[in-house]
Each structure stands twice: as C-alpha cells, then as structure tokens.
C-alpha cells in the first residue's frame, strides 16, 4: 500500500472518476518538488495559496519545479527543507458541460381579465462552460468550498431564478 501512496504523490492529476466534474480539488496540499502534474486537454490546473490564485497550468504534462514554473517559488514549504510546496490545486474543466435542468417558481401575478392569482413557473435546460477558471475558483469554489457538480449547478440555478422578470 505504501508504494501506491508514494506513486500517488509523484503524479498529480484529476482521477478518471472526476472526469465529469466541473471542478476537482486535489486532496493533498503538500506537493512534492519535481512531482509531475498532468492536466487533461479540456482542463486547467489552478494553484491557490492563502486565498489567492498563484498560477495556472495549461493542458499538458508539467514538472513542478520553481525553475520551470516561477510562481511555485512563492509557496515552498521550508519546513520540509524546500522539498515540497504547500498549495491547493483545483482542476477546472474548460469543455462544455451540457444538459443541466432548472425550474422553479417565479412569481404570482393577477390575471387582468379574471382577477385570479396565477403562479408563474419556469423550466429549462442549460450548459456550463467555464470561461475564466480563476474567477470561478476565487468567487465560488474558494469562498464556499464548493467542488461538486450538484452544488455548482444548484448555485447557477438559483442565480437563474433570482434574475427573474415578469412582464
């Protein structure tokens, strides 16, 4: 079991089980120096330290070294003798995530002809594509620690229903 744990610390990537997620948070904040980060073609990796985005890795394979990626030098863990970085890593999908449904009550209006109160409801379907991964992490994921699709789509649905307008 120890060999698998060591191997897991050498390679940083979103697991296959997270491929359908909009955001996946790497579970360990201690990242070994010279570990390899693998970012899928439809994702980016966002590095956060103390509530700030420190850097973004584009798709590809990257060796985590401060010489190759200068922003890593800002969060070297000196307690480890400089052999590790302390950072949160979020893998953010940049492809389109389709077929999310929403629906709910909008408002009550009075029918001018009959005088009856009518409850208006709306239903629809939407897709999500993350245009700015840094903003998503800073404004939604990082502040309320939301990383699963249900929580993110719940927030989006609430935003859609809150921006209602009755004509």
Task: Label the model's feature ranges.
Residues 1-141, 145, 151:
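Interfacial loop/beta elements and low-complexity acidic/Ser/Thr-rich segments
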Residues 166:
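Conserved small/polar residues in nucleotide/adenosyl-binding loops
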Residues 152-162:
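Extended, charge-rich, solvent-exposed interface segments
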């Amino acid at each position: 079991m120890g060999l698998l744990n060591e191997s897991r610390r050498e390679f940083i990537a979103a697991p296959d089980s997270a491929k359908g997620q909009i955001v996946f948070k790497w579970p360990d904040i201690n990242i070994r120096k010279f570990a390899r980060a693998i970012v899928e073609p439809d994702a980016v990796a966002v590095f956060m330290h103390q509530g700030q985005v420190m850097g973004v890795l584009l798709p590809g394979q990257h060796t985590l070294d401060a010489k190759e990626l200068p922003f890593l030098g800002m969060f070297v863990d000196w307690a480890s003798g400089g052999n590790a970085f302390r950072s949160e890593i979020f893998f953010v999908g940049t492809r389109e995530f389709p077929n999310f449904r929403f629906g709910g009550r909008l408002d009550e209006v009075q029918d001018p002809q009959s005088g009856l109160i009518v409850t208006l409801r709306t239903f629809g379907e939407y897709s999500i594509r993350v245009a700015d991964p840094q903003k998503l992490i800073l404004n939604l994921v990082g502040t309320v620690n939301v990383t699963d699709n249900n929580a993110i789509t719940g927030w989006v649905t609430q935003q859609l229903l809150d921006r209602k307008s009755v004509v």
